[in-house]
């Protein structure tokens, strides 16, 4: 009796160094900003530790370290960043990138140690939520010549940043089809929402400003970006985050605002103005800001009312 021998084709398992774990980690995150930050911070770590880029072999070597040695390396890196005077938030962000790489590798079975016992530096939670006033922002809005393509576009962007407290990434990632003119609604990619678009309501004036810009739009088709570049080299392409930043910065300089203004500070200004207009109705303004935590808005409200400054004035009066 003869037995048939089945030949089974086998695939060799790729050695550890052939796994591009860093690339897999980056692809596991939706946010382009997160991917860029992780890539940059991990490159800085490997440059400090091995004087090399984080290529697969270097990462495989890092992931093969025993627990005690890995933690010792990270603690030395943390100390070196402190010695260079880096801010606590910067140190914590770089540690978070490295911890994320290790956690991801553990899930893949490519790492046996953990960095969860390495603690970040304590960061003061205060944030400067000041920006500009509605009166000064009206001056800024008067700058663009709305009878030109660039002026119509810039006016619409500035007004949208203020009225809807948008982040600049939320503004530039919108498409023509995301604007529902009849319903006065714009669908945006909100922070932390992946690829899910969220609706924001628009004022009549905002819809009119967007309609004025669309008459100049290089190619106002549904899938096209709502805001496009108008320079010769990038004509018709999606407007970049940096272009919006420069628009705000130069506009503030043109009206001699006297302080630095950025798209995010316009967002701060809009949220603060909304708190003023609603008598500090935090829950209502949360619908505008789309903050997930009320505590964040509470900081805006505290800064708006300046309770500490009020107490200082009382104490000063006690001195006569």
UniProtKB/Swiss-Prot annotation:
Any one annotated GO CC term: cytoplasm
As for subcellular location, the record says:
Cytoplasm
Q: Where is the Tyr recombinase domain?
A: 127-313
Record's protein name:
Tyrosine recombinase Synpcc7942_B2651
List UniProt keywords, sorted A-Z.
Cell cycle, Cell division, Chromosome partition, Cytoplasm, DNA integration, DNA recombination, DNA-binding, Plasmid
Organism name = Synechococcus elongatus (strain ATCC 33912 / PCC 7942 / FACHB-805)
Q: Which family does it belong to?
A: Belongs to the 'phage' integrase family.
Quote any Pfam family the record assigns: Phage_integrase
Q: Where is the Core-binding (CB) domain?
A: 16-106
* PROSITE patterns, sorted: CB, TYR_RECOMBINASE
**GO-annotated biological processes:** cell division; chromosome segregation; DNA integration; DNA recombination
Q: Any idea which residues are catalytic in this one?
A: 167, 193, 264, 267, 291, 300
Name the major location.
cytoplasm
What does this gene product do?
A: Site-specific tyrosine recombinase, which acts by catalyzing the cutting and rejoining of the recombining DNA molecules.
Molecular function GO terms recorded: DNA binding
Gene3D superfamilies on file: 1.10.150.130, Intergrase catalytic core (1.10.443.10)
